[in-house]
Amino acid sequence: MITFLDKENNPLSQKSYDSAVLCLQFHQLTCSCGHSGCLNVHGYYKRKVKSPSGSFLLKVCRVMCSECGKTHAILPSSIVPYSQIPLICCHQIISDLICGNKVVSVCDNYPDVDENNVKSVIRRYIRHWKEKLLSEHISLSPTDSLIRQCFSHYSMQFLQIHRTTNRLFVNTT
């Protein structure tokens, strides 16, 4: 999978995703096999994303490497891989937990996020990420820095739990 750094306060929608993917410099993307300039659009798949206005299906672009044949999803950094809950919502849950605030308050802003989703995010953080962040002195804020440091140290998006290869792409234009 390849994650591109998107604007921090840009609400995710199909239109914003499509626009961001169109602006990507595909010739600069690197496959997990190490080759650059070899990724071509292979297809799309749909995944559910929970947003403040409700859940929606996001059509995610997949690319295939012409060198090794592997396929990769192209995801914005506002998405946590293998989760329907966006990063900004997860970040709010964890921040509330750390500050001792009522963590279910996030459900007020995200109507499709229920208490079980909140518990799942907290469990994922405690089991897989809390010690990682502490050991590398990674702060939760700003989010952009959190994302970059998680990729730098662990080659994963914050709160990603599957060890699937994930590369961060920072568009230079």
Model-derived segments and their meaning:
Residues 1-79:
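Short, conserved DNA-binding cores of transcription-related domains
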Residues 47, 62, 123-127, 148, ...:
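Arginine residue identity/basic-tract feature
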Residues 69-159:
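Short, positively charged, Gly/Tyr-enriched micro-motifs
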Residues 9-10, 40, 101, 109, ...:
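Detector for Asparagine
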Residues 6, 19, 28, 46-47, ...:
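Intrinsically disordered, low-complexity regions enriched in small/polar residues
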Residues 1-12, 26, 134-173:
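Long C-terminal interaction/binding lobes of large macromolecular proteins
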